[in-house]
Amino acid sequence: LNNVEMILSYLVGAAAFNFSYMTMVMVRMTRRLQAMLLQDSLTGLPNRRVIEARLKQEWRRWARHTAPFTVLAVDLDHFKQVNDTHGHLAGDEMLVQVGQRLLAGVREVDTVARTGGEEFLLLLPDTDAAAARAAAERVRASVGDEPFRVRGQSLRMTASIGVAQVGEGDADAAAVLARADAALYRAKGAGRNRVCGADAAPAEGAPAGSA
């Protein structure tokens, strides 16, 4: 009988241990999956899903309290030449370093995201037009003023930036983002390595959701 009790006790203990271990493994796997869904796999920055969710949050805050926010759309100029000339590993390394420089130049409350390829988005809460323009110029300088040390080589890069501050004519968060993108294309068309502000949103009354 004692042997049976010992065996049963062992089996129960082993089952409890295995359950605890499997639970721990599942928790870790869940966290990794969540990170994969929310982070850019190359740079570790938030991805488009994250910044669009935060943009919607800021939009709701604007609609309720008229709290200003600004979006910066950033695109690296002629980045394809880096990949074509130095290889994709060099391009990837430069993207990581660009992300680090962008993070170093903003506040903790700001969001820096890589949204694909050589494109980044920055969300700056509680930022008026003058502060937004200054922030955009700092971002541009952080990319272009100093060369990048990539795989033993010194490589130059510049960035074009579109700036859009939320306005009463914006129907939703996507409208602010669209104006930032349009300003970015104007910066590209005007010669690159520059900051362009978005056209003001056409006023159509109070922001949605302000009632």
Regions found by a protein language model. Name each.
Residues 34-35, 48-68, 99-107, 125:
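Short regulatory alpha-helical coupling segments
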Residues 35-53, 74-88, 96:
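Conserved nucleotide-binding and Mg2+-coordinating catalytic segments in signaling enzymes
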Residues 98-100, 131-148, 179-181:
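Alpha-helical scaffold within the catalytic cores of cyclic-nucleotide enzymes
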Residues 112-114:
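A short pre-motif secondary-structure segment
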Residues 130-133, 151, 164-211:
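Catalytic-core segments of nucleotide cyclases and related cyclic-nucleotide turnover enzymes
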